Amino acid sequence: MLVFIDADTILPKYFIQSFENRVNEKHFQAGSFTQKMDSDNLAIRAGAHFMSGYMRLMQYTPWPIGFGCLYITIEAFNAVDGFDESLYIMEDYDIILQAKRAGYKIGIIKMGCLASDRRYKNNSLHQILRGIYGELYRYTHGLRITKPIYEYNMGGEDKDNSKDTDPSKQKFK
């Protein structure tokens, strides 16, 4: 099993044991983990809760999604040729969709991984609107976004370099 976890995520104490138990119990072959947002801001925490619920709902549709923390069997990863590097954004959504289309069992596991709010602290409304726009774009222009639809700074890069957003230097509350 391959597990991909965002750099700014803290895993629960018994993550590996719990993860293995849930995957083996349900026979999941690809999917994602729910996340909680480490934030003092109620709106940011509520947004993360909504997105976890949305992700869990989408696993039962023809268009499952996963983000932040993903898992996939090596067999499924190879069958879908891994992450598609031609995608501009949402490659994590795409690999889960491709695994489902290839016949692999998808599951969203409720794990309580703790994610940093660093991307949302200063521009949460902007981030939320971009996320909604990205979702609407996917469903109206095809599920694969291969061209820039908005500016996206990978890994928390700050375009004006006025503050350090390196995830390895972030502190959790």
Question: Predicted segments — roles?
Answer:
Residues M1-I10:
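Short beta-strand-to-loop acidic/aromatic patch adjacent to the donor-nucleotide binding site
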Residues F4, G31-T34, I109-M111, A115-S116:
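Short glycine/serine/threonine-enriched helix-capping/active-site loop
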Residues K13-A43:
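Conserved donor NDP-sugar-binding/catalytic core segment of glycosyltransferases
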Residues S32-G68:
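Short, flexible, basic/aromatic active-site loop/helix in glycosyltransferases
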Residues G66-V80:
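Conserved nucleotide-sugar donor-binding
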Residues Y71, I89, G107:
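Short aromatic/basic micro-patch
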Residues I89-I95:
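Acidic donor-binding loop at a coil-to-helix junction in glycosyltransferase catalytic cores
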Residues K100-K173:
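Hydrophobic helical membrane-anchoring modules
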